[in-house]
UniProtKB/Swiss-Prot annotation, chain B:
Pfam families: PP-binding (PF00550). GO terms for molecular function: acyl binding; acyl carrier activity. 4'-phosphopantetheine is transferred from CoA to a specific serine of apo-ACP by AcpS. This modification is essential for activity because fatty acids are bound in thioester linkage to the sulfhydryl of the prosthetic group. This is Acyl carrier protein. GO terms for biological process: lipid A biosynthetic process. The gene is acpP. Pathway: Lipid metabolism; fatty acid biosynthesis. Keywords: Cytoplasm, Fatty acid biosynthesis, Fatty acid metabolism, Lipid biosynthesis, Lipid metabolism, Phosphopantetheine, Phosphoprotein. One of its GO terms (cellular component) is cytosol. It comes from the Bacteria. Its main location: cytoplasm.
Length: 249, 79
């Protein structure tokens, strides 16, 4: 079950903790993975860890804050793999936290651009081929805060909520062609993004998690691997909450 | 039949998987050739690519038949 042999998968933000785990898991299931991100050296080292022999792992750096780069990435990934894309995982994202009354327009705009507009552009580019081929899987990594909100993250939670709404629309547009579009909404996962939290903040968060631990990147990767598999072919437009029970929307 | 008409017909046959004899000038993509709304958008995109033209949204909405497509593209190419 859940094998991905012969599938071509593009994972954005593959230099980060969750993205690297997703790439590793999809590769382990047999997929050819294209790792994208802004940091070429980190991507190269993740690729080398995933596939020491270099098989079925390619690196395509891209700065998704540039609209043209997002459009070009799908083409570059297909060129690197030498085959059309079967799977798109929109994982790249960033935060610019701050209370709303002090949030600058540029912090709002940058998060909207990278966390919402870029995934849209990647979906648009990937869907063209997927619709024609009548097959494809798109999974976008949102966040629990896109559902619950979070003080200090008006921009990030708006972008992630936007990603959920966008995916439902795309799921309706692409459904007639057998293409599924879903979302994974991680809770509190141990990555560089959450390492910056203060100890008191961390303890408070942990108290709200029924399963009593922080998530690991592999917890998220497993959910993605399921949604992109052939077996998940009747699931579309959904958001899979992977959060240890922290929120049960 | 013009070169453009031939090429349009070929794209329609290929994309909608219909028999060539059914692709008459009067044939409506949706009513006669079984296209859904997504097919019509994809057809317009295929025309744009094949003929290196840009078909804006308001023009695309008016392209309902094979002849509509041929006429529009011929007009663009003549301009």
């Amino acid at each position: 079950m859940f094998r991905l042999d012969g599938k071509i998968a593009l994972v954005t933000g593959a230099s980060g903790g969750i993205g690297a785990a997703i790439a590793r898991t999809l590769h382990g299931q047999g997929a050819t993975v294209i790792l994208s991100g802004t940091r070429q050296a980190v991507l190269d080292s993740v690729a080398a860890q995933i596939a020491p022999d270099g098989a079925r792992a390619h690196v395509c750096p891209a700065d998704l804050s540039d609209p043209a780069a997002a459009d070009a990435l799908v083409a570059a990934a297909e060129a690197a793999a030498g085959a059309p894309l079967d799977i798109l995982v929109n994982n790249a994202g960033l935060t610019r936290d701050g209370l709303a009354i002090r949030m600058k327009d540029e912090d709002w705009n940058r998060v909207m651009e990278v966390d919402l507009a870029a995934p849209f552009r990647l979906c648009r580019a990937a869907l063209k081929g997927m619709l024609r081929r009548r097959a494809g899987r798109i999974v976008s990594i949102a966040s629990i805060v896109g559902i619950t909100g979070n003080a200090g993250q008006a921009n990030y939670s708006a972008a992630k909520a936007g990603m959920i709404g966008m995916s439902k629309s795309l799921a309706q547009e692409a459904g007639a062609r057998g293409v599924t579009v879903n979302v994974v909404a991680p809770g509190f996962v141990q990555t560089a993004m959450t390492d910056v939290l203060a100890e008191a903040q961390r303890e408070k968060l942990l108290a709200g998690i029924p399963l009593g631990r922080m998530g690991q990147p592999d917890d998220i990767a497993a959910a993605v691997a399921y949604l992109v598999s052939n077996e998940a072919g009747w699931i579309t437009g959904t958001t899979l909450n992977v959060n240890g029970g922290m929120a049960m929307p | 039949m013009s070169e453009i008409a031939d090429k349009v017909k070929k794209i329609v046959v290929e994309h909608l998987g219909v028999e060539e004899s059914k692709v008459t000038p009067e044939a409506s993509f949706i009513d006669d050739l079984g296209a859904d709304s997504l097919d019509t958008v994809e057809l317009v995109m295929a025309f744009e690519e094949a003929f290196s033209v840009e078909i804006p949204e308001d023009a695309a909405e008016k392209i309902a038949t094979v002849k509509d497509a041929i006429d529009y593209i011929e007009k663009q190419k003549a301009a």
